[in-house]
UniProtKB/Swiss-Prot annotation:
Enzyme class, UniProt record, top EC level: ligase
Keyword Cytoplasm applies: yes
Annotated motif 'HIGH' region, positions: 15-25
Chain ranges of the tRNA-binding domain: 575-677
Molecular function (Gene Ontology), one example: tRNA binding
Cofactor binding: number and manner: Binds 1 zinc ion per subunit.
GO terms for cellular component: cytosol
Reactions catalysed according to its record: tRNA(Met) + L-methionine + ATP = L-methionyl-tRNA(Met) + AMP + diphosphate
Protein name as annotated: Methionine--tRNA ligase
Annotated function: Is required not only for elongation of protein synthesis but also for the initiation of all mRNA translation through initiator tRNA(fMet) aminoacylation.
Organism: Salmonella enteritidis PT4 (strain P125109)
This enzyme's EC code(s): 6.1.1.10
Subcellular location: Cytoplasm
Ranges spanned by the short sequence motif 'KMSKS' region, renumbered to the chain: 333-337
Amino acid sequence: MTQVAKKILVTCALPYANGSIHLGHMLEHIQADVWVRYQRMRGHEVNFICADDAHGTPIMLKAQQLGITPEQMIGEMSQEHQTDFAGFNISYDNYHSTHSDENRELSELIYTRLKENGFIKNRTISQLYDPEKGMFLPDRFVKGTCPKCKSADQYGDNCEVCGATYSPTELIEPKSVVSGATPVMRDSEHFFFDLPSFSEMLQAWTRSGALQEQVANKMQEWFESGLQQWDISRDAPYFGFEIPNAPGKYFYVWLDAPIGYMGSFKNLCDKRGDTTSFDEYWKKDSDAELYHFIGKDIVYFHSLFWPAMLEGSHFRKPTNLFVHGYVTVNGAKMSKSRGTFIKASTWLKHFDADSLRYYYTAKLSSRIDDIDLNLEDFVQRVNADIVNKVVNLASRNAGFINKRFDGVLAAELADPQLYKTFTDAAAVIGEAWESREFGKAIREIMALADVANRYVDEQAPWVVAKQEGRDADLQAICSMGINLFRVLMTYLKPVLPTLSERVEAFLNSELNWDAIEQPLLSHKVNTFKALYNRIDMKQVEALVEASKEEVKAAAAPVTGPLADFPIQETITFDDFAKIDLRVALIENAEFVEGSDKLLRLTLDLGGEKRNVFSGIRSAYPDPQALIGRQTVMVANLAPRKMRFGVSEGMVMAAGPGGKDIFLLSPDDGAKPGQQVK
């Protein structure tokens, strides 16, 4: 039965543009793509979009490390991501970037509306600052102990253990991820989104059916603990969009990231010359449906901040959030050392996309449970289901049809009632696809496949083929088998796009959900060719080994400090023990008249003063900034007479030279004169 066509916009969470796509990412994109392909088969208007999340300090710093601009890095990463998704047949209508004109305009529009409506608040805050790098530290560049559950090694914006969000200043024992230094507090004016104003709306939306029950229950905990205003600004230097009329202030990446859904759709509409669909889909009273597929780690942002931002700026809210769990491999977290941290591109060098699409689909449900990719079970299931049950059904019958009947199917079904049993299952299987009970859909389909194969076993066409005068029976039996195969592949089409294309070529007919009511009768099929190959554990072993080698290659420095300055010849412990390293306090620092390279440092060793000349002037053009700082010096180096005076030691610094010299400093708590061991 044909359904009333709906307008549907589907998104996946935006991959961050500083790393490759791996099998953890692919779970979400496969889940969404299967759902989208089913919706399209049912005749709905579906727009499936995504983009790279391309802003933030991590991208800025990684680009600096690579010696390229952030724009160049995110451009290259976008191409890599799109290639990976295309390789897995993820059928996006558009793949864009948050670093785009569309996203800038929409971010500014939403911010302006929120501000005009009184939902943006300004206040001065004390913020963590890296004294060694001279920069404010974004959330993800501070780590410490979660103030809520006391889990160690958590980022400065939210805890990956308990899901709580907080300010970086609330972290216990924070450390800069950039330098390892203990941050200091500095004041800065920031802009806040008044999330508590939307508490009543959000609680109603939470219980409206827009969220899975597990998510709604978790949100209730957050409501009970009280919503806080959300800091949406970051200080320069920052790679992102500058806030209007606020020089040196930038939108926090999590403000413009979800707006990227809108930006990508706007870009798609503009490409099509479509001037009406954007408003039709995003206006406050839109009757279109909006679905976000996301992982459970970003529920807080999508279930609180995002709908509140949309409500406050007079746009529509999502129809549903579809939240999934994490991927484990062989029962454990993905591991680089074990070779189970597998990139999407690496997978495609060893297996086809349909195999992973099928395995993930067979394990997915509408719940937020984690999915385990057991590689041995993967091989067994793909061979047992796709090869033995489904493809084998076609191969057992196609040969007789091709050879004995010139590829023409019988004019009537051998068992109309059995065929009706298969087509009647469309309601149950369709509902399972619709409700994202993918595992249930696969179980129903494979149960039918068992029935179809039993039918062929019982009818034994290979026996009938040898009996004189039974050509009509043989044609009817094999035609029945091929028609049952057609129904099964129609149900599996959202999952197995590549195999489906081969099947359509063989059947000489499109796999169409509504068309299965009518079997293929007196229809000519094409010559049968192998549709799918068995897989084995040797491929798995090669995949795991290749992943290990990629990790080794990534860890090996092709260029950089070790390549430019190889480690010196090995010394003995006794040689090293002769060097006396001490903590020193810089009491004074000044230029040396007549030298453009040296600074004169007066060092306090805790009761003894030293005069040291150091060639660090190019890196520290303001020597006064060094006063009061601690460093490390070689205290037992023989005094050296220089043109400007006597140098009584050497301070320790890293870097290749020039402006890239970095004076070493001990952690807080070290005292002048203490020995460095």
